């Protein structure tokens, strides 16, 4: 049985060769160049087509180390305010008053108070004083008492 299989194998390349030859003959007669229509341009300005722009793949990073975050939790909150009006806020409104970094925003102040004093913050109001410092009114969550927290951190 094996010799018959060997005899059948050479036949297909002959058929393929014949088909290839016919295809070549047809191409010679007809011509391989297709007749592409020329695009009619309606504008005098030529807009260059958008080409593929590959992303940069640098051989080495341009910065040796990432920049250190200078505005960490300890830098954001400078000190608590202990004025009479601040004490009134602690007693009446469940609010602590801090002097904070001018560049800090409300979210950063909230996170800093949460981390440093382990308390939940309801909301933060800020203002910039005439002397250029930023004051933050930190309203505590209802389940925390501002008077207890003030005692713990040493305001009172």
Swiss-Prot record:
Region annotation Beta-like import receptor binding (BIB) domain: where it falls in the sequence: 32-74
GO biological process: translation
Keyword Acetylation attached: yes
Numbered residues of crosslink Glycyl lysine isopeptide (Lys-Gly) (interchain with G-Cter in SUMO2): 14
PTM notes: N-terminus is methylated by METTL11A/NTM1. Citrullinated by PADI4.
Gene3D superfamilies the record matches: 3.30.70.330
Disordered: annotated span: 1-67
Any one of the GO CC terms: cytosolic ribosome
N6-acetyllysine, modified sites: 70
Keyword RNA-binding in record: yes
Compositionally skewed regions (Basic and acidic residues) per UniProt: 1-19
Residue positions, PTM Citrulline: 41
InterPro entries (UniProt xref): Nucleotide-bd_a/b_plait_sf, Ribosomal_uL23, Ribosomal_uL23-like, Ribosomal_uL23/eL15/eS24_sf, Ribosomal_uL23_CS, Ribosomal_uL23_N
UniProt-annotated location(s): Cytoplasm; Nucleus
Modified positions (Phosphoserine) in chain numbering: 43
UniProt keyword list: Acetylation, Citrullination, Cytoplasm, Isopeptide bond, Methylation, Nucleus, Phosphoprotein, Ribonucleoprotein, Ribosomal protein, RNA-binding, rRNA-binding, Ubl conjugation
GO MF annotation, one: structural constituent of ribosome
Bias type Basic residues, positions: 20-67
Role according to the record: Component of the large ribosomal subunit. The ribosome is a large ribonucleoprotein complex responsible for the synthesis of proteins in the cell. Binds a specific region on the 26S rRNA. May promote p53/TP53 degradation possibly through the stimulation of MDM2-mediated TP53 polyubiquitination.
Subunit structure of this chain's protein: Component of the large ribosomal subunit. Interacts with LYAR and GNL2. Interacts with MDM2; this interaction may promote MDM2-mediated p53/TP53 polyubiquitination. Directly interacts (via BIB domain) with IPO5, IPO7, KPNB1 and TNPO1; these interactions are involved in RPL23A nuclear import for the assembly of ribosomal subunits. Interacts with IPO8.
Free-text comment about domains: The N-terminal beta-like import receptor binding (BIB) domain mediates interaction with IPO5, IPO7, KPNB1 and TNPO1.
Family: Belongs to the universal ribosomal protein uL23 family.
Protein name from the UniProt record: Large ribosomal subunit protein uL23
Gene: RPL23A
